[in-house]
């Protein structure tokens, strides 16, 4: 065990001023944090006599930014002092927190700017605040002993006062998110006559053409070829050469071949598009895993943060294998990211839909345990989900969604998909129990709609997490599915399980309402339907 060092003392007058501001603004924000509608409405009316709720939220977020800067400074100081004695995993955990705190400041500044804008979009701001709450959860996960039971390289315990700062940031964000819900107005769901469209509106006409066109007809900006016939031989070099903070599409063509590298697209690499030669032809492969000392957040073969990322005709593979525990093939925290005809190949934790709004069309996802997980608002449409053969004695869970508050507009929606056994599981599927999902956090939300569910799924359908955790607060729903595994006669009887019986309830999880697909998918060029 590494000794815990005290956090460096700050000048007393700075602490006094900061605490004064904190107590004042926390008082304002907690006034509207009650879950009682009548109480909230009454207090909101009183507060808006002097300040509008957006102004209160801005004040709360500016306070939160101060706290994030304090947390970042303390994490950095602590990392510097402890670095020689930290394990590789512990260094990863510190790096994750510092990076996520930087992302937190970036997203909060965007939210403040948006709240001051005349074209205020409450849905976008709700998503930003939810993203930031997810960053705090991810930071603390890295230091959680319960999440690191696969090996013994987590010997350092984060000081309680630093944990409290992160939790306090989350509480502030929770208050802000709830205040936002008080004044936001949901857009009406599209009518059935309006949803049968080919593309969502957040994809531009140019991006639509890019996705429809064969690669030889695509005007790409850079090319990568392992045989030396492109601009670069590695994907990382091409990403480094791409512009920062681009507002227009930047296309990187990755010629067929196997590329053995871990690729990270930071937040500044926006509007990047990867185009390959097809599943199994353009393959990006690596093998980082939790067992080998990497944090789950750093295991991805490809990780993306910059907004507007698109991938087409590529295989993303983590080849660590079933014995290596968490080993992510792809991680997306890219808002308005979209994937078309891609493959995600791994075992445990294959596809990390970490945060923001995402869309997957005609993709193949392979895995064993929790192989689609995270807290994005994500829709899988016309895709195939394959359970692979796990280690002996393990149970298969297709999803592990991590929504942490009822106000968060996140969840996993599986629409018009196929839920199947992979070829290696088919001969032995009677030896393993497979489930549609299990809860990662208290308000976990996953729905299966108009999909084919094969006979590998256990009649109960869904798997408990730890004992009775989240069984009353989760939202797991099924609607108009087909196949031998779709029979709900013996499904779980948890309070949070829904046998969805009307189209209105199911419609809220389609592309239009759930990820605001009408506002951004058109620009990606990926075919989609806003409704069923």
Swiss-Prot record:
Give the positions of the site Transition state stabilizer.
348
Q: In which pathway does it act?
A: Glycan metabolism; pectin degradation; 2-dehydro-3-deoxy-D-gluconate from pectin: step 1/5
Q: Quick one: which residues bind substrate?
A: 296, 326, 438, 440
What this protein catalyses is: [(1->4)-alpha-D-galacturonosyl methyl ester](n) + n H2O = [(1->4)-alpha-D-galacturonosyl](n) + n methanol + n H(+)
Which residues are the signal sequence here?
Answer: 1-34
Per its UniProt entry, which superkingdom is the organism in?
A: Eukaryota
Q: Which CDD domains match?
A: PMEI-like_3 (cd15798)
Q: Glycosylated residues?
A: 62, 74, 85, 172, 221, 231, 244, 287, 382, 404, 502, 522
Cell location: Secreted, Cell wall
Give the positions the UniProt entry annotates as the active site: 349 (proton donor), 370 (nucleophile)
Query: One cellular component GO annotation, for this chain's record?
Result: extracellular region
Could you provide one GO biological process annotation from this protein's UniProt record? cell wall modification
List the keywords (alphabetical). Aspartyl esterase, Cell wall, Cell wall biogenesis/degradation, Glycoprotein, Hydrolase, Secreted, Signal
Gene Ontology MF terms in the entry: enzyme inhibitor activity; pectinesterase activity
Q: Where are the annotated segments for Pectinesterase inhibitor 39?
A: 35-169
Protein function: Acts in the modification of cell walls via demethylesterification of cell wall pectin.
Anything further noted?
A: The PMEI region may act as an autoinhibitory domain and prevent untimely PME activity during transport.
This chain belongs to the protein called Probable pectinesterase/pectinesterase inhibitor 39
Gene name as annotated: PME39
